[in-house]
Amino acid sequence: MAQGDDSKQAIAQIIRQEQALIFPSFDENEAFALGHRIRDIAVKEKLGIATEISLWDRQLFYATTAGSTVDNQEWLRRKFNVVRRFHASTYRLVLEQNRDDRMFALHKALNVEDYALAGGGFPIRVAGAGVIGAVIVSGLPQREDHNLVIRAVAEHLGQDPVALALPAV
């Protein structure tokens, strides 16, 4: 399969993920349960990551696992800024860079010190409220960061993570 074909399929699947993974409500308890799930998966699978769950005005959850580095915290901050700006998955924006209608265009004049175009940031969308924050993972290759977030959010919401997973590359 050509890379462009894979990107189109992956973008379409990420849009489906964004439409399907909607929380009925979201608070500190939801953030803790979801963050704990992400960390548990990472520990069980020996993944060196940092993860953060934040609303626009404050951080609700932060954790790291063995193998993560101080750089991961900075990546979390920059990915969060991208989700806050565009209300979209950071990995979708990565894949859209080869398209004419890309959202993360250079003309947007975003400072690379504050914005990271890398997978692993996903919007927290609440029914009736819209996007209120982000779930972020850093430490793995960007597609794997994204997949870890999707797996955990889908499981947390009682949805099938396999049905929502990106196609293998």
Curated annotation (Swiss-Prot):
It comes from the Bacteria. Belongs to the UPF0303 family. NCBIfam families: PRK02487.1-2, PRK02487.1-5. This is UPF0303 protein Oant_1766.
